[in-house]
Design a protein with these regions (language model features):
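Structured catalytic core of nucleotide-sugar glycosyltransferases
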Residues: 1-120
Length: 120
């Protein structure tokens, strides 16, 4: 597995289809060996429903549902524990981070860096 994208999900059910679309478009430019890990932090919006729909349509998406709201850091940690990628991207679910930036970050990583990060 080349890339794992770990996304804690809370309060962004409506953004998930667009997030998935943009991620798959971006990641497919880099490799076909990727996974998207969506960790539902027991969101009251019932984001889990949307995660299940996306998982059923795309085998590269893995969904995990936490039994209660543990918070963003623990949701990220749960996703990291399940990730298999050589490179791991952590991003928010509300599209405040551009999925398209992953392409640029990955290209920079291929120059021999151990860690690559972006800021706005």
């Amino acid at each position: 597995m080349d890339i794992s994208v770990v996304i804690p999900v809370y309060g962004c059910k409506a953004a998930l289809p667009e997030l998935h679309r943009r991620l798959t478009e971006s990641l497919s430019q880099i490799t076909d060996k990727y996974e998207i890990i969506l960790v539902d932090d027991n969101c009251p919006q019932n984001s889990w429903e949307e995660i299940v729909k996306i998982c059923q349509k795309d085998e590269k998406v893995k969904g995990f549902h936490l039994s209660r709201n543990f918070g963003q850091i623990r949701a990220i940690t749960a996703g990291l524990d399940k990730s298999k990628g050589d490179w791991i991207v952590v991003m928010d679910c509300d599209l405040q981070d551009r999925p398209e930036a992953i392409v640029e970050l990955y290209q920079k990583a291929q120059e021999g860096y151990d860690v690559v990060f972006a800021r706005r």
